[in-house]
């Protein structure tokens, strides 16, 4: 995708192993470095869902018109609600692509998990992501301290109410 172009259409597909390996190599800068992943081999050893052929079926890849991977989502049925995770190619951050992908994921969740609310967790300092989620109808409902692979962090729990 060329710099400054507007994406008119995104294609969604079940995330492939090749796309997952591409995601592992994405490198974020500044405060967002926290989202950089370990190597593929380390993630496989740790049981990361992205690297597991079966668990990866809950992930979707989003491609632009040039078939370049611009982001991914994970929609995981947790009984009463659906857990939502999202990642963007670092080159796409801050360009509105997250809003488009989030909207597409909400629509997919409505189709696949009829009537279930959608929940996500986001670091409390990540205003860019929080604003994206709010723009698509998510609301902050709680704050938690959560253990991650790099230690504890403060997270908002946000919910999209499907009523």
What annotation goes with each model-predicted range?
Residues 12, 94, 122:
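Conserved SAM-binding loop
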Residues 21, 130-131:
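Alpha-helical elements of the RecA-like P-loop NTPase motor core of helicases
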Residues 115-119, 123-130, 136, 142-163:
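C-terminal "cap" of GNAT-fold acetyltransferases
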Residues 45, 70-71, 141-148:
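A short, acidic/glycine-rich surface segment
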Residues 14-17, 24-93, 108, 112, ...:
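Acetyl-CoA-dependent GNAT
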Residues 88, 94-108, 131-135:
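Conserved acetyl-CoA-binding loop-helix of GNAT-fold acetyltransferases
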Residues 7, 83, 115-117:
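Short, solvent-exposed beta-strand edge segments and adjacent coil->beta transition regions
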Residues 1-21, 162-163:
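Conserved N-terminal entry element of GNAT/NAT acetyltransferase domains
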């Amino acid at each position: 995708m060329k710099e400054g172009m507007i994406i008119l259409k995104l294609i969604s597909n079940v995330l492939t192993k090749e796309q997952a390996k591409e995601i592992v190599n994405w490198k974020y800068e500044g405060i967002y470095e926290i989202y950089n992943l370990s190597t593929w081999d380390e993630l496989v050893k740790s049981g990361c869902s992205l690297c597991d052929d079966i668990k990866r079926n809950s992930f979707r890849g989003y491609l632009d018109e040039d078939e370049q991977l611009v982001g991914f989502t994970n929609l995981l049925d947790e009984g009463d609600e659906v857990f939502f995770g999202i990642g963007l190619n670092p080159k796409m951050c801050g360009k509105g692509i997250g809003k488009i992908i989030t909207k597409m994921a909400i629509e997919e969740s409505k189709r696949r998990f009829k009537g279930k609310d959608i929940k996500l967790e986001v670091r409390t300092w990540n205003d860019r992501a929080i604003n994206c989620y709010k723009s698509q109808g998510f609301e902050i409902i709680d704050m938690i301290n959560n253990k991650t692979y790099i230690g504890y962090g403060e997270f908002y729990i946000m919910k999209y109410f499907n009523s």
